[in-house]
UniProtKB/Swiss-Prot annotation:
Protein encoded by which gene: ABA3
Natural source organism: Pyricularia oryzae (strain Y34)
Function: Alpha-ionylideneethane synthase involved in the biosynthesis of abscisic acid (ABA), a phytohormone that acts antagonistically toward salicylic acid (SA), jasmonic acid (JA) and ethylene (ETH) signaling, to impede plant defense responses. During pathogen-host interaction, ABA plays a dual role in disease severity by increasing plant susceptibility and accelerating pathogenesis in the fungus itself.
Protein name: Alpha-ionylideneethane synthase abl3
Family: Belongs to the alpha-ionylideneethane synthase family.
Bilayer-crossing regions: none
EC class name: lyase
Organismal lineage: Eukaryota, Fungi, Dikarya, Ascomycota, Pezizomycotina
Keyword annotations: Lyase, Virulence
Annotated stretches, region: Disordered: 294-355, 440-466
E.C. code: 4.2.3.-
Low complexity compositional bias, start-end: 299-339
Pathway, per record: Hormone biosynthesis
Keyword Lyase appears in the UniProt entry: yes
Length: 518
């Protein structure tokens, strides 16, 4: 077990009593939530000119933190009053009033609360959440838009501009898409094991092939620095890029919500059973999304879809990839083998026979989409009543079924390949959305040096030996240097060392490519 530390929590007095009177939360949890909101705000919006807006942003983070592990306390659809201590409209007005995009950001935040509280409450088997998770896997572009909202990414970017009194600058939708995709790719690559310990449905590499995680992080990081250079002299540049920079990795070391100290100053350790157990107890304010087991006596119509998915699970669980998600390529979502001649009757059966609990509530929420959902979400949910692919693994109720597994849809090989291509196209899409960005081609790999045959003189080593003797005698020191110096005793120049490093990296890339083939 990792060591436990008695943390002292620091946060400004402005938020120190926000949760007074809220039942169901201990005083220790309240203080940790205040400190977490302060630390996150300081990390992702390190500079500000408007303290009142800054405090309002902290309050949105406090509410969000509670929603992430005690969803039953936050019901944005029921009332403007959140937990009896916040007027949501007042908080959002304090943050965005008079700024461009205000109405869009209000809908963005309400969507986050609606879906997040659904995931962390007893309503996780609802029709809303089932369709939401189905929609996550529909396509890479819709995934990144939904993940953007789930991470409050564009919301925080807009808040960062507001907190710096920048009212004449607002990214386009396309620019928001790319900025948040870069940030979410970086964050999810680092948070891979954290999210897996939580049984998350929302991690990029639960859908993008996990063997791309390191390469995707590397490329996204390059795009971050390309944007940083392109917008270095624009006032909004540092504000927007700083959010991505800190959100994409450093917060895992600086915020106490993560396990950097508890895990020996490391980032990215695979989760253990002990970590999962702590997650269930909300240690570090984490939350475990376990698959829900059907209650005894449940009717066949209630669990018909679970029966279909369980047959797939038993078939596909024999093979898993690095993402912790099973490969569902050999079967349809109904458990029928992929060589079946017709899938249309099956799809009709899935949409007409099964409907999760809370269907009426889902329809009423959909009718309020202009109030409670970001603009694209209504369409995503409407077309997610049935599977988008008959070879991917869909379920009626989502959550991790065992340790080292994510909790969402498990994509088939064909869909994973399509997602791979989308992620690989990131640099081209960044250049289209941000014309000022100038992409650079990486330098060509150095040619491999031939290994001298036995008895063959190494001319480069001889030259280094000669240079060393000349340098030493010219300085008036070590004049008794022997006429020849063994090559292995001669200090190597920096260019020679770097050349060997590049060759080693090429060899490693070759080995990775070979492994990927198999």
């Amino acid at each position: 077990m990792p060591p436990r530390f008695n943390d002292s929590w620091y946060y400004p007095d402005d938020i120190a009593h926000d949760l007074d009177g809220v039942e169901g939360l201990s005083e220790a949890l309240k203080q940790e939530a205040y400190a977490c909101a302060w630390e996150y705000t300081r990390c992702v919006i390190p500079q500000y000119t408007n303290w009142d807006r800054y405090v309002a942003f902290m309050r949105t983070i406090i509410i969000g933190i509670i929603a992430e592990f005690r969803g039953e306390l936050v019901d944005v659809a029921a009332s403007d009053s959140i937990m009896g201590c916040y007027s949501l409209s007042a908080v959002l007005d304090a943050l965005f009033e008079g700024t461009p995009g205000r109405e869009l950001m209000v809908r963005e935040y309400k969507t986050f609360l609606l879906v997040t509280s659904e995931k962390t409450s007893k309503r996780r088997d609802s029709e809303l959440f089932r369709r939401y998770v189905n929609g996550l896997a529909a396509s890479p572009r819709s995934w990144f838009r939904m993940r953007d909202c789930d991470a409050l990414a564009r919301f925080s970017l807009a808040a960062a501009l507001a907190c710096n009194d920048m009212y004449d600058v607002f990214p386009t939708d396309e620019q928001f898409e790319l900025l948040t995709e870069i940030g979410d790719t970086l964050y999810d690559a680092v948070a891979f094991y954290k999210h897996r310990s939580e049984g998350e449905t929302n991690n990029t590499f639960a859908y993008v092939p996990a063997d791309m995680r390191i390469q995707a992080f590397r490329v996204a990081r390059e795009m971050l620095w390309a944007l940083d250079v392109a917008y270095a002299h624009k006032p909004e540049g540092a504000i927007l890029v700083n959010f991505i920079r800190f959100f994409g990795g450093p917060i895992h070391m600086m915020m106490r919500r993560y396990r950097f100290v508890e895990e020996d100053l490391t980032v990215g350790k695979p989760e253990t059973a002990a970590v999962v157990a702590e997650t269930r107890r909300n240690f570090k304010l984490w939350n475990r999304v376990d698959a829900q087991v059907a209650a005894p006596g449940q009717t066949s119509s209630d669990n018909s879809s679970d029966n279909r998915s369980s047959s797939i699970s038993s078939t596909s669980s024999t093979g898993t990839d690095g993402s912790g998600a099973g490969d569902a390529s050999s079967v349809h979502s109904s458990g029928v083998h992929s060589d079946a001649t017709s899938i249309e009757p099956e799809k009709e059966d899935q949409s007409s026979v099964f409907e999760a609990p809370g269907a009426d509530r889902f329809r009423s929420l959909l009718a309020r989409s202009k109030e409670l959902m970001f603009p694209e979400l209504r369409a995503y949910l409407s077309r997610s009543g049935e599977p988008h692919c008959n070879r991917c693994l869909y379920r009626s109720s989502y959550g991790a079924q065992q340790i080292h597994r994510f909790g969402g849809v498990e994509l088939c090989r064909g869909c994973r390949a399509m997602w791979r291509g989308y992620v690989e196209s990131l640099p081209e899409r960044v250049q289209e959305a941000f014309p000022d960005v100038v992409l650079k081609a990486p330098p060509p790999p150095s040619p491999r040096r031939a290994v001298p045959a036995d008895g063959e003189a190494d001319s480069a080593a001889g030259q280094r030996s000669k240079r060393l003797r000349e340098d030493l005698t010219a300085a008036g020191e070590y004049t008794t240097v022997a006429e020849t110096v063994p090559a292995e005793d001669v200090p190597r120049s920096a260019p020679d060392i770097m050349e060997d490093v590049l060759q080693a990296e090429c060899a490693i890339d070759d080995m990775r490519s070979a492994v990927a083939v198999f």
